[in-house]
Amino acid sequence: MTKHWLIGGLLALACAAGAAGPEEDVFLRPVGQPPVAKAQRRQGGESLPPLPLPATPLRRSEQKHPPAPTTLIGKVIWGGYLDYTWPNGVVSRVFDWNMVPADAQQLLRHLKGRSGLEYQAVTLDLGMLSGDPAEVPVLLFSGGRSISFTPGERARLRKYLLDGGMVWFDSVAGSPFFSRSAAGEMRKILPEAPLRRVPADHPVFHLAKSLVAGETNRSKAQPFELEGVFLGPRLAAVISPVGLGCGWDNARPELIADARYYKPAAAVDLGVNLALYAVGWFDSARRYAAGESEAEPGTANPEQVPFAQLVTDGFWNSDPGSGDRFLRYLGRNLKVNTSGSVSYVNVDRAELSDYPFLFLNGLGDFTLEKPALEKLRRYLDDGGFLLVNNTMGLAEFDGAARRFIARLYPEKKLGRIPADHVLFTHGPYKFADSGFTAEAAARYPGETFPLLYGVSDGDRLALVYSPVDLAGGWQQVPRPGSVMYLSSVAGRLGGTIVTYFLTH
């Protein structure tokens, strides 16, 4: 990483190439109270005589230390430093990576107090990183000035993220220089995964405590904001443009005039949620890393029932591998002859009639242009079938899906599929309850049956929409906070939908 070394005086800047400019240096200041100057000690003429040693050595018993807790956070060393001279003459050296030295430790102390989970934080250099996220599941980069990585470090971080690790970027005092540079680095590390605003109903805001707004030094109720990079449904990297570390350690950056940071209660609330998300989603991250997401697109075979997933302008591949796992479920449990892997098709270019079953998955907003929409409508009118699924059951995709369906069928209404519909009454499975996770039950209280919506073409359902995530259940790994069906129900409900399609 580029090193910006700064030394000396009241606040002196080294002139080495690549050093940060003065406008950035104002965000690298000591955080907290000034250290107390050492008292001057004068030697007097008298002193105490040496104390006598005991005649017999005191017995000492070996103290047994319990094993160290599992590591959760690795705070990464990067950048350079500034020397700041306080009015009392004391000089504080402030490092880019360590403006709040106890931030991670204090966060984990709060995590233990709230959840009972005990973890430790370690300090590491990227050169020390083994690359195995099981050893250090979270990397924390904090700072006030611009951060940059070498090509080798970017490659190492890319592998770490794809293997299931999570990266946090904390702007400490709300430095725009740090946040913007972190965003730029993530675009270089994972160019295929654009940075997105994390939606307000995302699990990371609702795990330990449901968070909407928190107190900052500038606002009593600032809406929580995170920028994130998603790998599949998993939030792999987050950037907090409002500082977190000051609040974790109950410190105030009073020397930074333009500081913007969460007060302790809000910072700890969000930090604990982030930590629980990293812990709870680790198995899902490892599933993605294991290669389930890398299945090759299937090819149509006249002896098999081909299934295709639609490519849109949005985050269409929001749950890689889920479709393939579902097809294997169909083959094992319902003896449906499939290719074993899903084809990925673009409405504009594909011959849709080759694929009698289409699947549309998503996270966030999306749209289809009018020609593609008209082509898809002709396909459905000719007997095709479309299943739309809401990854993690979030509100943004729900709104986008309903707008899309309204444009696709302007003359029809999307309606609830009742329990006495033939899809359920003649299906291979019966449902005694909703099959929701706790989060889905909280989102849709009072539901006692699976929640599906549909659009009919005469007596036949041509389109089915699930606002509660089906595909997450097909993956059969924990996804805390997701509005989804239980794994035991998701496969059976998907099988019921496919059985209806095959028989109608």
State where each predicted segment sits.
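Structural recognition of the beta-strand scaffold that forms the well-ordered cores
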Residues: 74-75, 137-141, 166-170, 194-197, ...
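Aromatic-Pro/Gly-enriched surface loop or interdomain linker
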Residues: 20-138, 144-145, 244-245, 254-357, ...
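Hydrophobic h-region of N-terminal signal peptides that target proteins for export
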Residues: 10-19
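Surface-exposed patches in mature extracellular/periplasmic domains of secreted proteins
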Residues: 116-127, 169-173, 193-201, 284-290, ...
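Short alpha-beta junction capping motif
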Residues: 5, 138-179, 357-398
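Extracytoplasmic/secreted envelope proteins and their assembly/folding machinery
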Residues: 101-108, 154, 158, 179-183, ...
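Bacterial N-terminal signal peptides that target proteins for export
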Residues: 1-9
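An acidic, glycine-rich "communication" segment
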Residues: 44, 69, 81-87, 105, ...
